[in-house]
Curated annotation (Swiss-Prot):
One of its GO terms (molecular function) is structural constituent of ribosome. This is Small ribosomal subunit protein uS8. GO terms for biological process: translation. GO terms for cellular component: ribonucleoprotein complex; ribosome. InterPro entries: Ribosomal_uS8 (IPR000630), Ribosomal_uS8_CS (IPR047863), Ribosomal_uS8_sf (IPR035987). It comes from Methanobrevibacter smithii (strain ATCC 35061 / DSM 861 / OCM 144 / PS).
Length: 130
């Protein structure tokens, strides 16, 4: 298996384990980006706790699943979004208004599109989930 996009592989792993109604999953390899995305998902109650496991290679994340994810995935290409353009991408990737989140990387860190709208900053879209 080739790892061209570790974030896409991580979200696919989470989605597949959610569909199989499993309690937890292991994401490998670990990275700072995946850790930040997982912490954003945890703040929004899509997943439970997660922990980093050092396996003397690339590391792993063990994620507790809550069963709250219907669908999740990465957004490719990583669209640059201005602070007033989020609604266009909400219509494209989310099923209804105020249902689900877009995960955005901004100069202030990784956050949901709701937080980015409140702060009045733009960024690049990484992922969606609902």
């Amino acid at each position: 298996m080739s790892l061209m996009d570790p974030l896409a592989d991580a979200l696919t792993n989470i989605r597949n384990n959610e569909l199989q109604v499993k309690d937890s999953c292991v994401i490998s390899p670990a990275s700072k980006l995946i850790g930040e995305v997982l912490s954003t998902m945890q703040k929004e109650n899509y997943i439970g706790n997660f922990e980093y496991i050092d396996d003397n290679r690339a590391g792993q994340f063990k994620v507790e699943l809550e069963g709250n994810i219907n669908k999740c995935g990465v957004i490719k290409p990583r669209h640059a979004v201005k602070k007033d353009e989020f609604e266009k991408f909400e219509k494209r990737y989310l099923p209804a208004k105020n249902f689900g989140i877009l995960i955005v990387t901004t100069p202030e860190g990784i956050m949901t599109h709701y937080e980015a709208k409140e702060r009045g900053i733009g960024g690049r879209l990484l992922a969606y989930m609902y």
